[in-house]
Amino acid sequence: MTSRRWFHPNITGVEAENLLLTRGVDGSFLARPSKSNPGDFTLSVRRNGAVTHIKIQNTGDYYDLYGGEKFATLAELVQYYMEHHGQLKEKNGDVIELKYPLNCADPTSERWFHGHLSGKEAEKLLTEKGKHGSFLVRESQSHPGDFVLSVRTGDDKGESNDGKSKVTHVMIRCQELKYDVGGGERFDSLTDLVEHYKKNPMVETLGTVLQLKQPLNTTRINAAEIESRVRELSKLAETTDKVKQGFWEEFETLQQQECKLLYSRKEGQRQENKNKNRYKNILPFDHTRVVLHDGDPNEPVSDYINANIIMPEFETKCNNSKPKKSYIATQGCLQNTVNDFWRMVFQENSRVIVMTTKEVERGKSKCVKYWPDEYALKEYGVMRVRNVKESAAHDYTLRELKLSKVGQGNTERTVWQYHFRTWPDHGVPSDPGGVLDFLEEVHHKQESIMDAGPVVVHCSAGIGRTGTFIVIDILIDIIREKGVDCDIDVPKTIQMVRSQRSGMVQTEAQYRFIYMAVQHYIETLQRRIEEEQKSKRKGHEYTNIKYSLADQTSGDQSPLPPCTPTPPCAEMREDSARVYENVGLMQQQKSFR
């Protein structure tokens, strides 16, 4: 497991329920310290719109669920039950699934806070990307709830006087919502502490001065807190001219990584294929290019089209889920590539096409019209396309097309083209709402079609707007799957798609627009969740135990783990004598064991 941010060190059972119900989805979970048994912990899981609480015992030798498997650390216990679906069950056999960690809110929106990062990972980051005086703050792994200040103290080669890489780690204690380094002044926030020691450097016992010169910033963010990150990125960056914002700084750092993605593009460079490229230097990587299989065997270049498969690379914990959505990023059609375009759509069983450009912009051809007029039928080489109907929405036109092979009527399938018409000739849209509504329609259409192939996305070059739409869609899919408290990383996602097609997301404006679109999506989603919870929970007593008390005590084996239902919120109290902690006590509730 790469993160332990599901641990919430300072919340009660009531607060855990509120978090899971307002910010989580079914399958979301968190862990927290037990209030009734100090030293123990509680696992709180959202299931069927309610919350189950499971007691975790810490014996001093191991962690367990009062029986069953034993683990050396809390993280190993949680990881085990996340990975081994079906091991966590109620008495009646109902499975309790740990799918989506509900991450603890970061204590600061400062970009030098890296959240869950091990000491070794911090040293590697500071050695590879930092210089003398670079620093970051991270969560303590050995003392949950505390933090660590990691500072590079070697020279700019990463070496101290003895020739070794030197990174110093300073424990930051958090007690009674105050922060200190084990003595001296106490601060109200991590930011106040860091700012103090930037001006007043600490000195190690051996005399080394810990100078906090420049932060080593992270790009990871809890999606629910994107508003704070956008606010931070909108501030002036720490540059000499003081006119560049954090967005520029982050995008420039991303641009400097392009040298790591110099994959071969030999097929696009072949003389026979040059006239199939709209721009001579914007070519598909060989390792991800779409290879056309139905060409003339006597014409070796008939397998070429300027297009790449884009596969999102993010972890999923869902069982029995549909295959992850994939994309084809391609250029706008040329007159001599329209036939190949339809061959590709048919071969890949693509049912949705997203067009993000007008045919002509500022007097220049961006994409030839590759579809027939409404109600018309047209043949494109071996492919036949019939335009069944067109309908206009506020920002886009939807075309229902029928695609088949000439002479093979039984191969006909429906293809939906979503033509976004309101992207401005210069820059990006002022309001991301239109793009989000558009992508929502595209998502629902793709989801409604059984076994649909990749979504085809194109603009003119197939990298700028195309990359922007794809990255936004990938990030929103992650949030849909994992909930608003998942971690997202915009630069990392762009780097991932750039590893499959060169140059995806072209400008700082497009980069900023991605953040704005995700922020708008999160704000809208949170408002909807809050309104749903208000209407569902007002005066409603909920429980996740749907069977009688007799059912609870029947059976040959003790459950793994026993769990307690959530009681009415008005009756919140704790009973330390109970083995399984809950935020309330149901009348005459008996132990499951």
UniProtKB/Swiss-Prot annotation:
Pfam families: SH2, Y_phosphatase. Changing residue 61 to V: In JMML; also in myelodysplastic syndrome. The lineage of its organism: Eukaryota, Metazoa, Chordata, Craniata, Vertebrata. Changing residue 60 to V: In myelodysplastic syndrome. Substrate binds at residues 425, 459-465, 506. Changing residue 279 to C: In NS1 and LPRD1; does not affect subcellular location; decreases protein tyrosine phosphatase activity against CDC73. The SH2 domains repress phosphatase activity. Binding of these domains to phosphotyrosine-containing proteins relieves this auto-inhibition, possibly by inducing a conformational change in the enzyme. The modification N-acetylthreonine is found at residue 2. Changing residue 491 to S: In NS1; increased phosphatase activity. It is an enzyme of class 3 (hydrolase). Residues 559-568 have a biased composition (Pro residues). Widely expressed, with highest levels in heart, brain, and skeletal muscle. Interacts with phosphorylated LIME1 and BCAR3. Interacts with SHB and INPP5D/SHIP1. Interacts with MILR1 (tyrosine-phosphorylated). Interacts with FLT1 (tyrosine-phosphorylated), FLT3 (tyrosine-phosphorylated), FLT4 (tyrosine-phosphorylated), KIT and GRB2. Interacts with PDGFRA (tyrosine phosphorylated). Interacts (via SH2 domain) with TEK/TIE2 (tyrosine phosphorylated). Interacts with PTPNS1 and CD84. Interacts with phosphorylated SIT1 and MPZL1. Interacts with FCRL4, FCRL6 and ANKHD1. Interacts with KIR2DL1; the interaction is enhanced by ARRB2. Interacts with GAB2. One of its GO terms (biological process) is platelet-derived growth factor receptor signaling pathway. The keyword Transmembrane helix does not apply. InterPro entries: Prot-tyrosine_phosphatase-like (IPR029021), PTP_cat (IPR000242), SH2 (IPR000980), SH2_dom_sf (IPR036860), Tyr_Pase_AS (IPR016130), Tyr_Pase_cat (IPR003595), Tyr_Pase_dom (IPR000387), Tyr_Pase_non-rcpt_typ-6/11 (IPR012152). Changing residue 560 to F: In NS1; likely benign. GO terms for cellular component: cytoplasm; cytosol; mitochondrion; nucleoplasm; nucleus; protein-containing complex. It catalyses: O-phospho-L-tyrosyl-[protein] + H2O = L-tyrosyl-[protein] + phosphate. Changing residue 411 to M: In NS1; uncertain significance. Belongs to the protein-tyrosine phosphatase family. Non-receptor class 2 subfamily. This is Tyrosine-protein phosphatase non-receptor type 11. It is found in: Cytoplasm; Nucleus. The modification Phosphotyrosine is found at residues 62, 66, 542, 580. One of its GO terms (molecular function) is molecular adaptor activity.
